[in-house]
Design a protein with these regions (language model features):
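Short coil turns linking two alpha-helices in DNA-binding domains
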Residues: 59-60
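Basic amphipathic alpha-helical segments that dock to polyanions
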Residues: 63-73
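Non-DNA-binding regulatory cores of transcription-related proteins
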Residues: 73-155
Length: 155
């Protein structure tokens, strides 16, 4: 029976990237990577900075610079939701998913849809090979719909 090779960890991939690009392997960069891969869901730079202060003090500039490096290394994904500050999420170990974004409160909810995924996978692009996709659906969440209904009924 053939043993499957295990996937390299985010830390191993990051180390390879830093060596390949001749970047310094600083403890701050590794601490930021570790924090990102220890939390679930989306985060922004300022929120990550706040999280880092509990364990490993880094400057906000270091957070932003490291996010740029992690983006280039394909270890995180950046989302820009309708005028909000950039949101990030880890790229490894997460399933392909879509996002519904409330235009009233800004709440972001992830969802999966097999039909959308299959349609993207089946699509053949001329001179292009897709590696991943992002789909954002904008609208009003149930909570905000309910609030609006209550306000309208009180008028």
């Amino acid at each position: 029976m053939k043993e499957e090779a295990s996937q390299p960890s985010p830390t191993e991939l990051f180390t390879e990237y830093l060596i390949r690009r001749k970047h310094r392997k600083t403890p701050e960069r590794y601490a930021i990577l570790e924090k990102i891969y220890s939390v679930d869901g989306h985060f922004n730079a300022e929120g990550l900075y706040e999280l880092m202060q509990n364990d490993y003090r880094v400057s906000l500039a270091t957070v932003y610079n490291t996010l740029d490096i992690l983006l280039d290394a394909a270890l995180i994904v950046k989302h820009q939701f309708d005028g909000q500050p950039a949101q990030y999420e880890k790229a490894l170990g997460s399933t392909m998913h879509n996002h519904s974004v409330c235009t009233v409160c800004g709440r972001i909810k992830e969802f999966t849809d097999k039909k959308i995924y299959q349609a993207i996978q089946a699509k053949e692009f001329a001179n292009f090979k897709s590696t991943h996709y992002s789909l954002y659906v904008y609208g009003v969440c149930k909570k905000c719909q309910k609030k609006k209904k209550q306000i309208n009924s009180n008028i």
